[in-house]
Structures are given as C-alpha cells and as structure tokens.
C-alpha cells in the first residue's frame, strides 16, 4: 500500500508525521473528520479577509459590516464556491464579531501598505522527483514581491522553523518573494 497517493500538501505531510493512522483514515479511506471550532473560525476569518481584499474594502468598521452583510446573505464577490459555507460559519460564530473585525482590519492595513496586484488563495501543484505532487494554497501573493500566509492563532513556535513558506515559494516559483507568516 502506498500512503502518499495523489497530491500532498504541507498540512497533509504534518498529519502523516503526527499520526499515520489518522492520515490513512482521512485521505485513503476518505473518512470525514469533524472540524473543530478553531479550524472553522480560521476558515471564516480567511474567507472574510479574502472577500474584503477582493472588494477593496477600507480598513474600518463600517466597511467590515458591509462585508459581513454580503457573507451572511451568501453573496460573495470573490469566494463564490464558499458562499454557503461562509454564511453558515458566520451564522454559527457571529458572537466572535469583534475579534473577526480586528483581525480583518489589521490584514487590510497591512495589504494597504503593499504595491502590486494581489492574488488571493493561489492554488499550486508541482510534481516532485519522487512522482508525488506537492499542492497548496497561498493566502496572499503579489508575484515577485510578497507571499503571505495568514495565521489566526498565536502558536508562533509552531511556525518559526516550519518549511511551509519555503515549500509554498518553491511550489509557486516565487523564490524571490518576501515570505511571511502574518499573525493576526
């Protein structure tokens, strides 16, 4: 049996390293895992930030509220495929309004300091010499300039020595771009 079938991502490799049985159940047997609150809040936050950037949202509360109205109504400019899921997540986690707003405004302020046309949630897939493909998503990319990965938790140590950004840069041929985990 070959464990690493199909494309693998950094998070899949982490799962395999941490618990091969859990990896096998999820990616080989296709047994769904329930997402926890932290993962769901992270997905919601990433979706809000992507939508806010796509709509060229100003970094203030009124503009944030307008984005949330679109998300709650399932009417997204950017993340069409995620409309229903983000609306459901917002309905479930609307009590986290203040922290979602603060993180989004922080991200928008950082984006406002950049120059160039951003690409959001850039998917890549690159074949490795061993025959397996590496895949991933880049949260925020300005080709040749910036490669950012939004982090909504504060587990800094987990990422200090992580090869994730280097793998993402290599996978997208963006080796010269400034790479950063952006802790919101």
Where in the sequence are the language-model features?
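Short acidic, Pro/Gly- and aromatic-enriched capping/linker segments at domain boundaries
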Residues: 1-12
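Mg2+/Mn2+-dependent nuclease catalytic core
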Residues: 118-184
